[in-house]
Amino acid sequence: REKLRTALAGRDEPWEAAVTQYPGHGAELARAAAERGEPVRIYACGGDGTLNEAVAGAAGFGNAAVTHYPMGSGNDFLRMFGPDACRFYDLRALLDAPQAPVDLIECNGRLALNVCSVGFDARIGLGAADFKKLPLVSGPLAYQLSAVRTIVQGIHRPYRVTIDGERLPGEAFTLICACNGRYYGGGFNPCPDAVPDDGLLDFVVVPAVSRLTILTLIGKYAKGGAGDIPRILLRRGREMHVACERADRINLDGEELVDSELSVRVSAKKVNFFFPEGTHWIPEKRVRN
């Protein structure tokens, strides 16, 4: 609140601050603000989960816009702004910032701004929370323990994957990722060319591979080299359906959903996102060309 008071000194716009009290509260607060009908700008102060809730609440409201004041450990959606991502720490730069409508991912009725995934990566990331409940376990150690457990249990599972009506070859896959943004999992970059306002999702599908293979490929995948890895399937489209043999953990911007089927599509709703003047999410390759 003190940072807000300092940034807003000398301005006459009304503002209010609220602290979320339980899961989903951020979405309720954002929706309530948007439903008033007046122009409103919502600053999600927290991590990717906080941003996810604010976006879910403001989705579909033309009078509302959302941004992210990063206070989490990942802040993955902002990574697509490259070196300019640090400018989101400057509240003054966000006060009169331009805004643009961006797409959203809809998965089984829930919304995500950045990435939806199922498989090896989702089980590691979401499973870390299980180990954080243990005494003296936190941060990187929790993810390491989750990775060990996932590798021991098996890194690929039976899935049937269909994208825009095309049934992908294979009966088992290591991970399946639908991207509106470019980064997830604390900096992994599966889709370096994804943009959040083109009306399409970028899909990355890794077929069943051995434990040794995944360990040798994970570095290239993390650095945006998925397109250079043989057998990885890349698609750009509007919807995907995944049928799992049993209920699995699904990652939605770091939030968890458990289901045996995924229906993923570009949502009919959009959300206005505002960002510091002079920044943008155009991939470097497209700028050069």
Residue ranges with predicted function:
Residues 26, 48, 176:
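Short conserved active-site loop signatures built around small residues
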Residues 1-42, 52, 280-289:
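ATP/NTP phosphate-donor binding region
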Residues 132-142, 192-213:
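Gly/Ser/Thr-rich active-site loops/lids in small-molecule metabolic enzymes
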Residues 50-63:
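Short Gly/Thr/Asp-enriched flexible loops that form oxyanion-binding sites at enzyme active sites
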Residues 163-165, 170, 195, 205-289:
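ATP/nucleoside-binding phosphotransfer catalytic cores, i.e., glycine-rich phosphate-binding loops
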Residues 145-148, 157-165, 185-191, 225-228, ...:
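Glycine-rich, charged/polar anion/phosphate-binding loops
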Residues 20, 60-177:
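Catalytic core of DAGKc-family lipid kinases
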Residues 117, 121, 177-191, 256:
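Glycine-rich phosphate/pyrophosphate-binding beta-alpha loops
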